[in-house]
């Protein structure tokens, strides 16, 4: 009788445990690099197999540099009002496949009338670069030849210890300057 009671108690406890634990396990972990579902579907359709760069994709030194400046933010995703219209806009660094090789691509996604517009801006090569935003302002290229006066936040696409490129919306198109080379 004692064995049967113990078996029923253990079985009930296990069932209750599974009922509470299973939903927590079934939910995906949020690492700050997750995309809205509808955008994820659009990215998957346009770039099959692509994914957003995360901290694990960075070289050890690059991860330290990024975390020093941006904490636990996602290195492959930044939300900003790039176009100045207040509509959802994200800059993404995607890891894509080019044959057997990994490649990276910077894209800007902009939600207009419940549809995401995806605009490729640049490629970054096989070693994962990062992206972040900067406030509106005056920016001069590394050579001192070109100046951008941004009225909206800008995008910085960077491969630490190699290069950094700034992208600003001019109202008519995207202006690009090298801020580190």
Which positions does each model-derived feature cover?
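Acidic/hydrophobic-patterned starts of short beta strands in beta-sheet-rich repeat architectures
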Residues: 77, 84-94, 146-156
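Acidic, small-residue rich beta-repeat scaffolds with periodic aromatic anchors
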Residues: 6, 19-52, 116, 122-181
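Bacterial N-terminal signal peptides that target proteins for export
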Residues: 1-12
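Extracellular C-terminal loop/segment signatures of secreted glycoproteins
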Residues: 104-123
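Bacterial N-terminal signal peptides
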Residues: 10-20
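Secreted/periplasmic proteins that engage bacterial cell-wall peptidoglycan
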Residues: 62-89
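Transition segment at domain starts
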Residues: 47-64
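Structural motif
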Residues: 99-108, 162-166
């Amino acid at each position: 009788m004692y064995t049967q009671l113990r078996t029923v108690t253990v079985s009930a406890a296990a069932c209750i445990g599974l009922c509470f634990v299973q939903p927590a396990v079934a939910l995906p972990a949020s690492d700050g690099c997750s995309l809205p579902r509808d955008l994820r579907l659009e990215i998957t359709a346009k770039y099959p197999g692509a994914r957003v760069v995360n901290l694990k994709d960075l070289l050890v030194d690059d991860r330290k540099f990024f975390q020093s400046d941006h904490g636990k933010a996602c290195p492959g995703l930044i939300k900003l009002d790039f176009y100045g219209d207040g509509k959802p806009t994200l800059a993404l660094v995607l890891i894509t496949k080019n044959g057997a090789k990994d490649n990276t691509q910077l894209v800007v996604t902009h939600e207009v009338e419940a549809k995401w517009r995806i605009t490729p801006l640049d490629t970054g090569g096989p070693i994962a670069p990062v992206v972040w935003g900067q406030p509106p302002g005056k920016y001069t290229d590394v050579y001192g030849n070109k100046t951008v006066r941004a009225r909206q936040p800008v995008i910085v696409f960077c491969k630490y210890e190699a290069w950094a490129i700034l992208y600003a919306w001019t109202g008519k198109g995207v202006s690009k300057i090298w801020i580190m080379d």
